[in-house]
Amino acid sequence: MRFAFSEDQLAFRDAVRDLVAKVAPPATLRAVWDGRRGYDPRAWSHLAEMGVPGLLAPEAAGGLGLTEVDLVLIMEECGRAALPGPLVEHAAVAVPTLAGGSGDSLTAWLQAAASGEILVSAGLDGPAA
């Protein structure tokens, strides 16, 4: 059994690392942390161009159809840069949740989420929320 990352995984990781270093320098990160938005739309847009929001979405829905291992490599790079944003809740929680459903309206939401056109997150409801 092989436990090493593939060349494709490492190349994608390196591309995200380079992108994050370019679009999210420390001054930009400080501005986001001090602001009210909680993420940098410009950085999110660049990540979306690379397919990161839809990394776990099936290719038929416009996603990359990759695995959780691939996503962890990307999350690690975003964490290394302290990039604020909805990556975990969007790409690791919401997109796979949408992908597990069915129906035309759900497919449309999944496609929009996979492309990064919309941001999706999970919310809690109920007395303990």
For every predicted segment, state its role.
Residues 1-8:
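Intrinsic disorder at enzyme termini
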Residues 21, 26-129:
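Glycine-rich flavin
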